């Protein structure tokens, strides 16, 4: 299989660079271990590789290690450790880390609850074009979550930006706004279009519609 051969070749290149303590390749090896691409799936090894690269200051690995601690992937679940590593990456402007850390702020997971900071982080990640953050911020505006004034047109605009990048949840949410005419002019054809794109990704709400 050509894909498997390419994966194996990539792993070999990552290994050679990792032996020279090149942090991006160490993190890439970690991802291969986490996903089982070109290497047997080994989540504890993935977390260990992320840690090695994270301790070298590599932002992508810091975010991935934080996510491992958040979800218990290859390590015991530890929200406080998750916050430590996500914070390091977020301070360097890593959009996924800011988005994940915003959820910790909202939930008080591994840290003191801080909705104001959570919104600030979510906004920054959304402004950088990170689709899940745009979708989540849209959800906040649609429902008036976390002290935000409800703004359906703002929600629709954020969902659209996220949906156009392929975010299935945003596609479904945007479809709902078009279906009900909330924040946008009602348009059944556009509603169907966005529901269909969401359903193609097997997103439950999109499938339901």
What are the functions of these language-model segments?
Residues 1-5, 19, 37-41, 55, ...:
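Short coil/turn and helix-start
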Residues 2-8, 12-24, 31, 63, ...:
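Intrinsically disordered, low-complexity repeat tracts
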């Amino acid at each position: 299989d050509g894909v498997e051969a390419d994966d194996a070749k990539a792993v070999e290149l990552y290994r050679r660079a990792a032996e020279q303590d090149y942090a991006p390749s160490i993190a890439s090896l970690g991802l291969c271990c986490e996903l089982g691409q070109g290497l047997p799936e080994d989540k504890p090894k993935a977390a260990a590789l992320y840690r090695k690269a994270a301790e070298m200051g590599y932002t992508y690995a810091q975010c991935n290690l934080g996510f491992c601690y958040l979800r218990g992937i290859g390590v015991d679940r530890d929200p406080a450790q998750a916050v430590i590593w996500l914070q390091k990456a977020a301070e360097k402007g890593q959009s996924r880390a800011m988005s994940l850390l915003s959820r910790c702020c909202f939930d008080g997971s591994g840290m003191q609850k801080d909705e104001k900071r959570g919104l600030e982080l979510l906004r920054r990640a959304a402004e950088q074009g990170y689709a899940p953050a745009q979708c989540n911020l849209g959800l906040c505006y649609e429902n008036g979550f976390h002290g935000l004034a409800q703004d359906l047109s703002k929600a629709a605009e954020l969902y659209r930006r996220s949906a156009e990048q392929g975010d299935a949840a945003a596609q479904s949410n945007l479809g709902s706004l078009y279906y009900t005419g909330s924040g946008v002019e009602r348009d059944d054809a556009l509603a169907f279009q966005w529901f269909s794109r969401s359903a193609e990704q097997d997103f439950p709400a999109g499938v339901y519609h």
